[in-house]
Design a protein with these regions (language model features):
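Cyclic nucleotide-binding regulatory module and flanking cytosolic helices
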Residues: 1-35, 45, 76-77
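Inter-domain helical "communication" segments and dimerization helices
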Residues: 2-6, 10, 31, 99, ...
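Short beta-strand segments in beta-sandwich/barrel cores
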Residues: 30, 38-39, 55-61, 96
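His/acidic/aromatic-lined binding-pocket segments of jelly-roll/cupin-type domains
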Residues: 30-32, 40-42, 46-52, 68-69, ...
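Glycine- and acidic-residue-biased ligand/ion/polar-headgroup-sensing regions
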Residues: 45-64, 73-74
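Cyclic-nucleotide recognition modules
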Residues: 64-121
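Polybasic "coupling" helices that flank or enter modular domains
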Residues: 116-175
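Phosphate-/nucleic-acid-contacting segments
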Residues: 152-210
């Protein structure tokens, strides 16, 4: 199945998250983080895992702040240590997050013998990363923009209401601002999408070619 047909899959949460959070975290582990808080996957030499039970976070690279996407609770992040240590989170809304040392998480997994649950979750997330990579390396600039619009329309209302469509796409792709603005203007002119003050309100129908 092509990425074009699977774009909606990227927003579907892992079916293994709820039992994973229940098994690993307790209420006292969670802290309330304000919007725009930044969390890293390493504290000194210690790798960390983040468990989000309320709110949404943006995942970005440390080196250039390139946005990899916005994810909403529930979330369990940090199991893939080599990859995670190059990333950070930024809360897009007030969020409840538990941050635990990776070694402590692995000790709990061993104690409760939930390796199968963790493996299934990691496989699910790995598949999402593969799909997202397909979206970012689509054949044409319009394909890339199209995928991002389909992602944006699925974001929570508060994110769509506070984020200009062009900025959302600019932060997550290597497309130029001018090409993004041109394609959005043409889509709006053709009544394919509805934009108000630059914010995406609706997608009526997206053509497969530009």
């Amino acid at each position: 199945m092509a990425a074009r047909d699977r774009h909606i899959d990227i927003k579907v949460p892992s079916p293994h998250l709820t039992p994973l959070l229940t098994a690993i975290t307790h209420d006292e582990d969670y802290r309330l983080w304000k919007k725009s808080s930044k969390l890293f996957f390493r504290r000194g030499a210690q790798p960390l895992c983040h468990f989000v039970r309320k709110g949404s976070v943006l995942i970005a690279r440390n080196e250039d702040a390139f946005s990899l996407g916005i994810l909403s609770a529930p979330l369990a992040l940090g199991f893939t240590v080599p990859l995670s240590e190059h990333l950070h989170l930024r809360t897009m809304a007030e969020s409840e997050i538990a941050t635990l040392p990776y070694e402590q998480v692995m000790a709990i997994v061993e104690e409760k013998q939930i390796w199968d649950l963790v493996a299934k979750h990691v496989m699910f997330v790995t598949n999402k990363i593969f799909i997202y990579n397909e979206m970012l390396t689509a054949p044409t600039s319009f394909d890339i923009l199209r995928y991002q619009l389909l992602m944006l329309i699925q974001e929570p209302d508060e994110i769509r209401a506070s984020t200009a469509a062009y900025q959302y796409i600019l932060d997550r792709t290597r497309l130029s601002r001018s090409s993004i603005m041109k394609m959005l203007a043409e889509l709006k002119k053709g009544h394919y999408i509805q934009l108000e003050n630059g914010k995406l309100q609706a997608i009526h129908h997206l053509p497969t070619r530009f």
